[in-house]
Amino acid sequence: MKRRSSFLVFLGLLLASPLALANDQHTVSFGYAQTHLSSLKNSDSKDLRGFNFKYRYEFNETWGMLGSFTATRNEMENYTWKEGKLHKNGSDSVDYGSLMFGPTYRFNDYVSLYGNAGIATMKFNKHSKEDSFAYGAGVIFNPVKSISIDASWEASRFFAVVDTNTFGVSVGYRF
């Protein structure tokens, strides 16, 4: 997952570089993401934590496109108490990733909204894997012309019973 995540981020940066020569506005942002799984409601397990990378291209003063890549993970150690000692039973891991695209709408120099849709992947213990439709929305603030602050939400459903909600906050550079 780490190798694939690194490759996708590198590929996104590589593909975005020629676009930077155009006169239009671009924003690249990076931040924190946290995924909550509905199946963990009554569990001691923690939410998945990771990162979010976004690239925004504005066609004109109002409309643009946004691409988003999210990767979160959690690894849990399993222990049992046997014969007065604590024994490690192994570990479980959950990986979540999404790649989404969608339109952006700029209300003024400071506030933009966006919606996006794409594909998400969830993997349990490197064995059980499923792809699913993902969708999301977010708001982007530009407190100054070259800085963006983004708050996002995305959702998906896996294995017909596991709902995911991913929340993200990122900071970006607008050029």
For each feature predicted by the language model, list its residue ranges:
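Hydrophobic, lipid-facing positions within transmembrane beta-strands of outer-membrane proteins
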Residues: 28, 49-53, 97-101, 133-137, ...
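Flexible, solvent-exposed loop segments that connect beta-strands
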Residues: 34-47, 70-95, 119-133, 159-162
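Short glycine/proline- and aromatic-enriched beta-strand/turn motifs that initiate or cap beta-hairpins
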Residues: 20-73
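Cleavable N-terminal export/targeting peptides
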Residues: 1-25
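Transmembrane beta-barrel strands of outer-membrane/channel proteins
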Residues: 28-34, 67-71, 115-119, 151-155, ...
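Repeated loop/turn-to-beta-strand initiation elements of outer-membrane beta-barrel proteins
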Residues: 26-28, 61-67, 110-113, 141-151
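Outer-membrane beta-barrel proteins
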Residues: 19, 56-61, 104-109, 143-145, ...
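Outer-membrane beta-barrel "beta-signal"
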Residues: 27-29, 105, 137-142, 146, ...
